[in-house]
C-alpha cells in the first residue's frame, strides 16, 4: 500500500509548516486507508483480497479469481456453521461485537484474515457480511449495467433457457472483479436457499435481503414496481446460478507454492513465471458450532492436504458431494496460471485460500 506524503507547504515568509501539522495530516490519510467498509470494490481488493477456487466433480480444484477478504472470511464461516440457522440473514448480531469485527477487517496489515471467531456468533458474521456489501459505493452490479440485468425479466414469453443465455452474456460483460464477486455471492446464497426448510431463508427472502447491495438504483428505491423487478432478477440469478459458473475443462490449479506478493498486486489473474515448489503440510482449525445459540464451542484440527468434510455443509446444485474449504485466514500463498475459462464441466462450491502479503507496512 502506497501512502502519499506530499510536499511540505511554504508560507509567504518562507517558513515551513509545522512538523506536527504535517504528521497529523499523514496519520489521518493512513487512517482513511484503513476504512475498508465503504470503499469501492476495486480499492477493497487492493487493500485485502483472497483467492477463490472451484472444485469439479472429480475433486480437482481450479483457480477462479479474487474477492475481498472480509467477504471470503465471513462467507467461509457462514457456509460451515450457519446453513441451518433460522433467519440467519435477518436476525441482528451484537452491535458491540459487530463494531469489533468491522474494525478487525478494516485494520492492516492482516485485515482480519487470521481473526479468531471464538466468542462471536454466526449472526455477527452475517451482519458484517451484509454491511460490507451494502456499504460499497457502487453496487456489485454497477449502475451502468442496471437496466441490462433487469431487461430479461421484463420481456414477456421468454423461456428460462433464453433468460439464462441473456444473463450469461451480461455477466460476461461485467468488470472482472464484479463478475467474480457476483458469482461467489450467488453460489453462497444458493447454498442457503437449498437449506430453506431449516433456515427459512428461501431464495425469495434472500433476493429481497441482498437486492439493495447487488442490483439497485437510487431513483427506484421508493417505487415498489421498480425494486420488485430487481428482486425478481436477483431471484432468477440465485435459482440458476449453476448455469453461470465458468469452468475450466482441461487445465487444473497448479500446486500450492510460497509466492511473494506486492501490496499493490492488482485484482487480475497472476501469471506463473517459475516452477512451483510444494509447501509443507500445515493444519487449520475448524469451528465446532452449536446451532441452538449460534456460538462457537470448540476447535478441531485438519491437515491442510486432507479433504475435510463437514456434517452441516450442504451439497451445491453442481453435484451431490459435500464441500470442503480452506479457511481464507490460513496460509499458504499461491501462484496461479492465467486460464481461458469455458463452461464445459460441472463445478462445486467456491473455495477460498488466503493470499497474504509478503511486504507489510
From Swiss-Prot:
Keyword vocabulary terms for this entry: GTPase activation, Membrane
Biased composition (Low complexity): 306-323
Domain of life: Eukaryota
Keyword Membrane: yes
Entry-linked Pfam families: RhoGAP
Domain Rho-GAP residues, every copy: 52-245
Disulphide linkage map: none
Function recorded in the entry: GTPase-activating protein for Rho1. Has a role in the negative regulation of (1-3)beta-D-glucan synthase activity and cell integrity.
Protein name (record): Rho-GTPase-activating protein 5
Amino acid at each position: 500500500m502506497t501512502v502519499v506524503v506530499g510536499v511540505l507547504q511554504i508560507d509567504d515568509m518562507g517558513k515551513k509548516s509545522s512538523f506536527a501539522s504535517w504528521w497529523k495530516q499523514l496519520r489521518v490519510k493512513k487512517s482513511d486507508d484503513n476504512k475498508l467498509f465503504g470503499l469501492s470494490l476495486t480499492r477493497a481488493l487492493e487493500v485485502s483480497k483472497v483467492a477463490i477456487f472451484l472444485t469439479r466433480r472429480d475433486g480437482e480444484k481450479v483457480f477462479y479469481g479474487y474477492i475481498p477478504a472480509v467477504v471470503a472470511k465471513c462467507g467461509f464461516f457462514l457456509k460451515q456453521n450457519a446453513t441451518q440457522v433460522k433467519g440467519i440473514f435477518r436476525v441482528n448480531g451484537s452491535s458491540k461485537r459487530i463494531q469489533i469485527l468491522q474494525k478487525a477487517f478494516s485494520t492492516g496489515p492482516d485485515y482480519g484474515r487470521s481473526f479468531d471467531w471464538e466468542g462471536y456468533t454466526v449472526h455477527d458474521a452475517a451482519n458484517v457480511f451484509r454491511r460490507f456489501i451494502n456499504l460499497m459505493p457502487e453496487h456489485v452490479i454497477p449502475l451502468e449495467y442496471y437496466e441490462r440485468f433487469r431487461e430479461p425479466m421484463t420481456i414477456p414469453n421468454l423461456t428460462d433457457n433464453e433468460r439464462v443465455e441473456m444473463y450469461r452474456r451480461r455477466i460476461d460483460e461485467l468488470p472482472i472483479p464484479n463478475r467474480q464477486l457476483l458469482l461467489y455471492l450467488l453460489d453462497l446464497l444458493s447454498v442457503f436457499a437449498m437449506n430453506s426448510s431449516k433456515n427459512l431463508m428461501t431464495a425469495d427472502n434472500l433476493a429481497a435481503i441482498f437486492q439493495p447491495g447487488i442490483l439497485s438504483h437510487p431513483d427506484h428505491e421508493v417505487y415498489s414496481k421498480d425494486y420488485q423487478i430487481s428482486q425478481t432478477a436477483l431471484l432468477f440469478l440465485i435459482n440458476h446460478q449453476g448455469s453461470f459458473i465458468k469452468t475450466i475443462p482441461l487445465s487444473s490449479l497448479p500446486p500450492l507454492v510460497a509466492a511473494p506478493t506486492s501490496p499493490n498486486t492488482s485484482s487480475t489473474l497472476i501469471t506463473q513465471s517459475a516452477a512451483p515448489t510444494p509447501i509443507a503440510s500445515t493444519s487449520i482449525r475448524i469451528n465446532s458450532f452449536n446451532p441452538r445459540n449460534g456460538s462457537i464451542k470448540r476447535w478441531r484440527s485438519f491437515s491442510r492436504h486432507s479433504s475435510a468434510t463437514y456434517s452441516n455443509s450442504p451439497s451445491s446444485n453442481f453435484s451431490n458431494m459435500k464441500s470442503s474449504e480452506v479457511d481464507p485466514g490460513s496460509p499458504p500463498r499461491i501462484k496461479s496460471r492465467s486460464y481461458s475459462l469455458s463452461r464445459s464441466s460441472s463445478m462445486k462450491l467456491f473455495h477460498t485460500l488466503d493470499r497474504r502479503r509478503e511486504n507489510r507496512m
